[in-house]
C-alpha cells in the first residue's frame, strides 16, 4: 500500500502522466492499491466470518484482474470509444476485448456455475474444470506482447527492450509455476516485481545520460540533430 501511494504521488508531482503507457501504469497502480486495501480489510476484519472460500474468491479476482490488464483493456476501449477521439480497429477490439470479457464473466459467475473454481464441503478452494483458461489467455497476451515488442523494436531503446523482455519472461515463468502449484502469496510477489520493472521502464532512474540531459527519446533527438546539421550544410 505504501509503495503504491509513493509511486502514484511521485508520478503526479513530476507530471509524468502524459504518455499512454504511463497512464496505463498509473491505472494499474490504482488497481493494485485498491485490491491490496481490500485484501487487508478482508483478512483483518472479516476472515473469521466469510470463510476460506470468499477469501480465495477475492484473491483470484483481484490478482487475475491485474494480471490480465483490466485497466488498459477496459478504460481505453470504453472511454476512447465513447469519446470517439481514439482510432481502434474493430478487428483488434474484438480480438482483445471479447475474449477477456468472456473470461471475466466466467470468473464473476463462478460461485453459481463452479466452472472456474469450486468450493468443497470443507469450504476449501479447488480448481474448476475451466481454471486452465486463465493460463491460456494470459499466455496469448504475453506472446502478443513479445511480438509487438519485436515488431516495434526500432522505436525502443536498449534499456526498454531489456526491461520489457525481463517483465514478460518473469510473468510467463510465474504463470508456469502457478499452473503447477497454486500460491496466492507468490502471485502478490509477482505483481510487485512486475510493477518494479514497469517503474524502471517509465521513470528511468538508472540511465544517467537521459536523466542529466532530460532527453526522453534518444533516437528522436538524434534524428532532429542530424536534420539540423544537414540544413546548415
Features from the language model and the residues they span:
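Alpha-helical transmembrane segments of polytopic membrane proteins
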Residues: 1-2, 57-69, 126-139, 188-194
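Membrane-interfacial segments
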Residues: 17, 79-86, 118, 153-160, ...
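A cytosolic-side transmembrane-helix exit/cap motif
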Residues: 44-48, 75, 79, 182-187, ...
